[in-house]
Amino acid sequence: MGKYNLVLSEYLSFVYNSQSAVQIPIYYSSNSELEKRCIEFHAKCVDSSKKGLSLKPLFEEYKDVIDNATLLSILSYSYDKYNAVERKLVNYAKGKPLEADLTANELDYENNKITSELFQSAEEYTDSLMDPAILTSLSSNLNAVMFWLERHSNDVADANKIYKRRLDLFTIVASTVNKYGVPRHNEKYRYEYEVMKDKPYYLVTWANSSIEMLMSVFSHEDYLIAKELIILSYSNRSTLAKLVSSPMSILVALIDINGTFITNEELELEFSDKYVKAIVPDQIFDELQEMIDNMRKVGLVDIPKMIQEWLVDCSLEKFTLMSKIYSWSFHVGFRKQKMIDAALDQLKTEYTEDVDGEMYNEYTMLIRDEIVKMLEVPVKHDDHLLRDSELAGLLSMSSASNGESRQLKFGRKTIFSTKKNMHVMDDIAHGRYTPGVIPPVNVDRPIPLGRRDVPGRRTRIIFILPYEYFIAQHAVVEKMLLYAKHTREYAEFYSQSNQLLSYGDVTRFLSSNSMVLYTDVSQWDSSQHNTQPFRKGIIMGLDMLSNMTNDPKVAQTLNLYKQTQINLMDSYVQIPDGNVIKKIQYGAVASGEKQTKAANSIANLALIKMVLSRIANKYSFITKIIRVDGDDNYAVLQFNTDVTKQMVQDVSNDVRYIYSRMNAKVKALVSTVGIEIAKRYIAGGKIFFRAGINLLNNEKRGQSTQWDQAAILYSNYIVNKLRGFETDREFILTKIIQMTSVAITGSLRLFPSERVLTTNSTFKVFDSEDFIIEYGTTDDEVYIQRAFMSLSSQKSGIADEIASSQTFKNYVNKLSDQLLVSKNVIVSKGIAVTEKAKLNSYAPVYLEKRRAQISALLTMLQKPVSFKSNKITINDILRDIKPFFVTSEANLSIQYRKFMPTLPDNVQYVIQCIGSRTYQIEDSGSKSSISKLISKYSVYKPSIEELYKVISLREQEIQLYLVSLGVPPVDAGTYVGSRIYSQDKYKILESYVYNLLSINYGCYQLFDFNSPDLEKLIRIPFKGKIPAVTFILHLYAKLEIINYAIKNGAWISLFCNYPKSEMIKLWKKMWNITALRSPYTSANFFQD
């Protein structure tokens, strides 16, 4: 057992270093004799520590425990109160504290003034502009850094250089924080007025960002970038990130392509040795120079110098530094503005009469036609989803806020809640539920707002619309997305696509006679000019569609959708400004509708099509691809002559002119070799991703606990690492130690061990080896997993009370009755479970469950209860398989070139040997025939877990299940009687196992699991026809081999002689695998 436990025990002696502090390790074992010794050992330790005796003799006496049992947790006593941080910090505060430039930002409150200057009193004060929104404190972060520095103060050679660099940067942070004193957080990890009033307002969030940056410093270049960003972000809280990352949009156009990967007809990436020269007009260089000058104006020195030096020969090798700067710039933290400024930002756009009406008209028509094209087929066929749109909307209703808090009665319990699902239930119970009436959002009922904060951009506002808007839009949007799924233009939704294929799409058509036009249209999406043509285009499309149907239900669905658009054309928003709530007419499109993503994509596609049709009047070219991806669109144009500087410049200016005729403030660029969009950038024929996920500051507070956030922190660290921004792993482990500790009393804390946090259980937080997901198969691992399973499902009294109320029951019955043709307990129970799960987002329920779980965990971490479970986990299956595998050394040579330069070496090596995966492995069961059959007749979407349960039932029961969901008895009978059904059994099992093994997350999503190179390392003699068993054996072998290769940079081959007698046993077991949900899996899901 590795590094974590070592770091843990050292950390504890670092933090609790007084005379009175004691650490008692707690061990456990699955061996009952040894377990008795573990219990004795613990009892004696507690006894000795009460008497104030040393524990050393006990460690000698119980050496067998320490050597053979597994560490479960460490119990830590400490009586001294926590001012330890301040005491230690003084030793590092040897430098000159930073002084904020109080004129650095346009908006007064974005300057880092002393809090009492920004907010005169506690009543006025809000922490919303600087709230780190993470369940860990500045003092913990400081402790973690000082712990690292102390541990490494004696490092030698290169390690010592890293130490010195970090020490130097920490001196800046320590001196500045020490000058004002470390702000104390309250129990919710927030910083109150009393604490902050005599300190700079942004001190905490700045210090968090700075710590995150300095703990990511390795090389001298990292040090220079970090130092500059740390110092300048203390004053500049508004534009720094934007200034530093702006040049990238031009840099990608400067590197020649010399060999690249392209997407071929089979949708695979294949290498192409083409050479494409970067053709760059002088005008572009002038723009770049201007960006660099702007950087210098705000005091940046080293970063612009690095860019300037790179520009001398624009080499791909040195481009990693550019991509590093681009990633680092995001780590200065979120830009959080006041809501009033975020809202007024869009409204400041001045209207000009001088716009090209004809262009607006063409834009509107293109939107109209696209809407019609998307929905034509389902409307003409009276699709059941469009007929039962209300039910579909209710089934997928979220538990997000509905915009206002209401008093609701559930049985005898009265609660206050803002949640949509609860409002729906309450309205239905009181006859107020009228989905046929879309409430207006005009001056009488202005829209409450949410916010979205992002580094390097201004705050954006989000509409929190009444639930009627969701119900009205849901079904139609689902149909739109279904169309987008098989339309390549929609890069974000296209089914076979992923980021790698989109990359190959662009490089495929780049050549000496083509250019690529890429535009960031985020400004346009939220501009006032877009509103009327956008909504009108949608309304006109819906009107045309209404004439294509005779079904009143479909017509009603389209009509309600149209009503949402009409209402939103006259929208008012309510913005808290100080103590008053202002009502403002808001004439722009904002996020918050169900249609946001789909409709924006449609509009952006219409926009670029219109631009291309305009420049086609002047140039002769073929449009090879048009793509839209979120806020960005791009197109590759092929001319009949080689591209020259003059052509690039002309096309560029013409495109910009066209946009300006529409008053669209967008950033349009033309290049011959690369593009830069929000999600990815292509330079020198290689693909890059921005590693900009903040670790120690979060965008907003949700209802996740410290454990969840520890898992999210780790998951963010992994994503950044795959994208080329690495934070010291030891620091991340220290943060996990801090965030997963559980306080028992003021002076007693329990720290879980590595085994607890990495075992695949409901408490899993991280992997003991980055990028490798291990499924423990030893006795102790399975034992602890069983123990945790016994306490995983926690009850909540509040939830039970709500669920047993008439209001809740009536709602679930209403849904069941509308959905089912005949009663079916599986579906009804499924709905009830889903609805009850939605109650989790109601804080009191969540807290209650969590409290129960923590207290159970506390008991468990002090003495695990052995527990005979009939549940089977994926670990049990792998444990059965493992003994039959024999390992031998093997050899695979590197045969693929690199196309993602930012990957860590070990991951890069595996990809270069076995190739990369350009598709998502289907892990939802949606490709199975039964799933398709259900969606043909019903709006109900069973989860992979439900399909897995259903498909293993008796044939009679499957038939009843299908019939109850509205599948005609004939079809249901045919299905069960055919071979398709047995194929489905296999397909669904396969999907389920892939889902359990997180094959589409982390770095596994990059590897080609069907690589012939991988297959040839596996030898499994074929015995009998049980495809499911063959599948699991092969998958296990592949994971073993890949994990070994990631860890050791070498290959093994596996031989498996699985006895035929065992196969049937294994097959039966495979139908009872329980899925485990943990903070770790939800963090993975959260990345999605």
UniProtKB/Swiss-Prot annotation:
Organism superkingdom: Viruses
EC number: 2.7.7.48
Cofactor field: Mg(2+)
Catalytic activity: RNA(n) + a ribonucleoside 5'-triphosphate = RNA(n+1) + diphosphate
One Pfam family this sequence matches: Rotavirus_VP1
Every RdRp catalytic domain range: 501-687
GO terms for cellular component: virion component
Main location: virion
Record key words, sorted: Magnesium, Nucleotide-binding, Nucleotidyltransferase, RNA-binding, RNA-directed RNA polymerase, Transferase, Viral RNA replication, Virion
SUPFAM superfamilies: DNA/RNA polymerases
Class in the EC hierarchy, top level: transferase
Keyword S-adenosyl-L-methionine: no
Protein family according to the UniProt entry: Belongs to the reoviridae RNA-directed RNA polymerase family.
Subunit structure: Interacts with VP3 (Potential). Interacts with VP2; this interaction activates VP1. Interacts with NSP5; this interaction is probably necessary for the formation of functional virus factories. Interacts with NSP2; this interaction is weak.
Function: RNA-directed RNA polymerase that is involved in both transcription and genome replication. Together with VP3 capping enzyme, forms an enzyme complex positioned near the channels situated at each of the five-fold vertices of the core. Following infection, the outermost layer of the virus is lost, leaving a double-layered particle (DLP) made up of the core and VP6 shell. VP1 then catalyzes the transcription of fully conservative plus-strand genomic RNAs that are extruded through the DLP's channels into the cytoplasm where they function as mRNAs for translation of viral proteins.
UniProt protein name: RNA-directed RNA polymerase
Source organism of the structure: Rotavirus A (strain RVA/Human/United States/P/1974/G3P1A[8]) (RV-A)
